Amino acid sequence: MTNQVLEALKNRRSIRKYKTEQIKDEELNAVLEAGTYAPTGMGTQSPLMVVVQDKGTIARLSKMNAAFTADPDGDPFYGAPTVVIVLADSTNRNGFADGCLVMGNLMNAAYSIGLGSCWINRAREMFDTAEGQKMLRGWGVEDKYVGVGSCILGYADCPHPEAKPRKEGYVCLLYTSDAADDLIG
C-alpha cells in the first residue's frame, strides 16, 4: 500500500547542512499549522512553539545547546535559519509526549513542502539553566514550560540522505490471543 503521506513518512530524513536563505513565511506558517494539529492527550493542545529567526538569538541558543555536547564550539543547529523550540506544559502529565508529537508533525510537514529539518536535542537542558529561564521569561513564556526539542528548518544544502535498512525485530507481531497467552504464560 502506498500514498503521499506514507511516502513522506518513509522518505523524510534529518538534514544537517543548510543554505543561509531564510524560508518563506508561507512555508513556515504551513509547518507551524501542521504542528498545531499534532495529537495531544485529551485534545489539550498543551505544547507551545517558539519561532526564532533572528540570527543573534539563534547564535545564542546554539551556544547554549552546544554547552551540553562533546563539541562546545560547534553549531548544533547546523546553520539552519529557523529554529522552532517546542516546549511542554510540565503540569500536564501528557505534556512531553504531546510536544514530541508536535516535533514529528513539524518535521514531516517540512519535508512534504520541500524543506529540510532536524530534531535537535537538549532543549530541556538549555531552558533549565538560569540563562534559559531568563530567555523564556523575556519571551513571555510561563514558568510551567520545559524544553522538548528544537526543530531546525531551512533549505537543504546537501544531497538528500538515503534511508538505512530497517533493523530486524523492530516489530513484534501478535496475531492471535493464543499467541499473546503463550508469551505471557
Annotate the PLM regions.
Residues L136-H160:
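A glycine-rich helix N-cap at a beta->alpha junction
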Residues R13, A88-S90:
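Short, histidine-centered active-site or binding-site loop motifs used for metal coordination
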